[in-house]
Swiss-Prot record:
UniProt keyword Lyase present: yes
SMART domains: OMPdecase
Pathway(s): Pyrimidine metabolism; UMP biosynthesis via de novo pathway; UMP from orotate: step 2/2
Keywords from the named record: Decarboxylase, Lyase, Pyrimidine biosynthesis
Organism lineage: Bacteria, Pseudomonadati, Pseudomonadota, Betaproteobacteria, Burkholderiales
EC number(s) stated in the UniProt entry for this protein: 4.1.1.23
Keyword set includes Transport: no
Pfam families assigned to the protein according to its UniProt record, in alphabetical order: OMPdecase (PF00215)
One Gene Ontology term of the molecular function aspect: orotidine-5'-phosphate decarboxylase activity
Domain of life per record: Bacteria
Protein name: Orotidine 5'-phosphate decarboxylase
Gene: pyrF
Family: Belongs to the OMP decarboxylase family. Type 2 subfamily.
Originating species: Herminiimonas arsenicoxydans
Single Gene Ontology BP annotation: 'de novo' UMP biosynthetic process
UniProt xrefs under PROSITE patterns: OMPDECASE
Length: 271
């Protein structure tokens, strides 16, 4: 099953367009996990088990693992997701961007080492930096477009042939790079006007939408701008607001409650 097929099925069977980010920060873990050698693995497994029925996808952020020399625990988490929740896509948030030969190694890392269904990539170096990912036709390639951070405007609004750069990227991906129907775009919830413009450009292409929760994006405005005609098409990501809803032994139950509330809030505006 391709990433797009798996995601489309998850939207329906899970009744969810909530993507749950896995950004483990041991400094925010509850006291009973502090100092344990497998704290990251135990924390993430508990979050996954508590929230899986509320999610259309999980998105581990590779930097949170690499900074702690915990890539082996990330491998275990991805394996755990594949084995326990094979119907839920795993998006490796890596935002890689490099020359073709190096990109090939990053693609192997994402899809062979971690077994991810999709990966985020940076398009700044052009097609040959993205091509190795696209060659895995069953995998998803999620391209940065209009990012949720304020500094994204430094580059993404630069004029490119009469349109801002982020719109040029949206056209480029939709018209030229998506020949296998495997692409998606990252567009921030913090910019609903631009989100609506990207949706108009790319049609039914899936959008990974960070920026709700801790970053302050409005769910109603996000859904109204990002949904497709049938009310789907989105992976609306929330990480910190779910992961760290409660800093004690009840952290997983609290995460579940926030995840369910967020999923339901998204669904209210999808009709």
């Amino acid at each position: 099953m391709t990433f797009i097929d798996k995601l489309s099925a998850a939207w329906q069977t899970q009744n969810s367009q909530l993507c749950i980010g896995l950004d483990p920060d041991p400094a925010k873990f509850p006291a009973h996990l502090q100092g344990k050698p497998d704290a990251i693995l135990d924390f993430c497994k508990a979050i996954i088990d508590a929230t899986a029925d509320a999610a259309c996808s999980f998105k581990p952020q590779i930097a949170y693992f690499a900074a702690l020399r915990a890539e082996d625990q990330l491998e275990e988490i991805c394996k755990y997701l594949r084995e326990r929740y094979p119907h839920i896509p795993v998006v490796l948030d890596a935002k890689r961007g490099d020359i073709g030969a190096t990109a090939e190694q990053y693609a192997r890392e994402a899809f062979e080492r971690y077994g991810a269904d999709a990966v985020t990539v940076n398009p700044y170096m052009g097609f040959d930096s993205v091509q190795p990912y696209l060659e895995r036709q069953d995998k998803g390639v999620i391209v940065l477009c209009r990012t949720s951070n304020a500094g994204g405007s430094d580059l993404q609004f630069l004029d490119v042939g009469g349109q801002p750069l982020y719109q040029h990227v949206a056209h480029l991906v939709a018209d030229k790079w998506n020949t296998n129907g495997q692409c998606a775009l990252v567009v921030g919830a913090t910019f609903p006007n631009e989100l609506a413009q990207v949706r108009a450009i790319v049609g039914d292409m899936p959008l990974l939408i960070p920026g709700i929760g801790a970053q302050g994006g409005d769910i109603k405005a996000t859904v109204e701008a990002g949904r497709t005609a049938n009310g789907t098409g989105m992976m609306i990501n929330s990480s910190r607001a779910i992961l760290y809803a409660k800093p004690d032994e009840m952290f997983a139950q609290a995460a579940r409650q926030v995840a369910l509330e967020t999923r339901d809030a998204i669904n209210r505006f999808c009709v």
